[in-house]
Swiss-Prot record:
It comes from Macaca fascicularis. NCBIfam families: MIP. The gene is AQP7. The lineage of its organism: Eukaryota, Metazoa, Chordata, Craniata, Vertebrata. Residues 55-67, 133-167, 218-221, 236-253 are extracellular. This is Aquaporin-7. Signal peptide: none annotated.
Length: 342
């Protein structure tokens, strides 16, 4: 009897500890920053698995893969990634897109390392996944050697490399320009004051955008247009046995897909804001459409109850006795446009 009672108390105590741990984990996972980190991690992982898998098919067996297949793999991989995390973090899946949104005031800088870390980890894990799934095919194709260049090179499955007909700085210009086109079109797709994609179709339209960039402009450099797509898999290949040549090949090409997209995304965003965003007519602010500018977009405020709010001429936020002290100044022009996220 005594032993049975002790056993029951021990079991009850273990369950209480388990519930407490689970509750703590659940509490942590519900934190906004953690959810956004996990969203970027998962969406980038999904995009990269489909994208790198399509490249593996093209490199390892022409019967099953093609350049068009690579574009479709990355394009619809982006679509699936947006579906996975679009309403949580915006599903950037691209450090250049995150950087541009931070630089243009759409996302606070404190989120930049969180988003990028999630993207890098997701991309690295996707590279490890493709390596595991295609391991025997890679060895069979290359004769057991992990080569960066040559007719049996397989490092290109995971990262981009400069082709013979391109110079380093032409490649830099190419990557910057393509990423600028990407960011400009992303702003257009999500600008509700212009001709945005229909609700529910943004993910598909963004995926089609990636396909269009690939089939029309991707030949020169393989269109990395994304540090999160190129650098983590490159680091994985270095660890997995391809060696330091993954960094030195192509006049030390590795840094170009990291730096050029950052500059290009900002340039594309600025061009859209100056030439399109600033010239688009904006409807006068209505009381029922009052908005508060938050960290990651524009949030519609609910109507007040019995207290009649007023609109301050200096701020778009509804002003009432309950919230007058928390009013913030009106944002600059570029923040007044609904540009959204990737």
């Amino acid at each position: 009897m005594v032993q049975t009672s002790r056993h029951r108390r021990s079991t009850r105590g273990s369950k209480m500890v388990s519930w407490s741990v689970m509750a703590k984990i659940q509490e942590i996972l519900q934190k906004k920053m953690v959810r956004e980190f996990l969203a970027e991690f998962m969406s980038t992982y999904v995009m990269m698995v489909f994208g790198l898998g399509s490249v593996a098919h093209m490199v390892l067996n022409k019967k099953y893969g093609s350049y068009l297949g690579v574009n479709l793999g990355f394009g619809f991989g982006v679509t699936m990634g947006v579906h996975v995390a679009g309403h949580i973090s915006g599903a950037h899946m691209n450090a250049a897109v995150t950087f541009a949104n931070c630089a243009l005031g759409r996302v606070p800088w404190r989120k930049f390392p969180v988003y990028v870390l999630g993207q890098f980890l997701g991309s690295f894990l996707a590279a490890a996944t493709i390596y595991t799934l295609f391991y025997t095919a890679i060895l069979h194709f290359s004769g057991g050697q992990l080569m960066v260049t040559g007719p049996v090179a397989t490092a290109g499955i995971f990262a981009t490399y400069l082709p013979d007909h391109m110079t380093l700085w032409r490649g830099f210009l190419n990557e910057a320009w393509l990423t600028g086109m990407l960011q400009l079109c992303l702003f257009a797709i999500t600008d509700q004051e212009n001709n945005a994609a229909l609700p529910g179709t943004q993910a598909l339209v963004i995926g089609i955008l990636v396909v269009i960039i690939g089939v029309s402009l991707g030949m020169n450099t393989g269109y990395a247009i994304n540090p999160s797509r190129d650098l983590p898999p490159r680091v994985f290949t270095f660890i997995a046995g391809w060696g330091k040549e993954v960094f030195s090949e192509g006049e030390n090409w590795w840094w170009v897909p990291v730096v050029a997209p950052l500059l290009g995304a900002c340039l594309g965003g600025i061009i859209y804001l100056v030439f399109i965003g600033s010239t688009t007519p904006r409807e006068p602010l209505k009381l029922e459409d009052s908005v508060a500018y938050e960290d990651h977009g524009i949030t519609v405020l609910p109507k007040m109850g019995s207290h009649e709010p007023t609109i301050s001429p200096l701020t778009p936020v509804s002003v009432s006795p309950a919230n007058r002290s928390s009013v913030r100044p009106a944002p600059p022009l570029h923040e007044s446009m609904a540009l959204g996220h990737f």
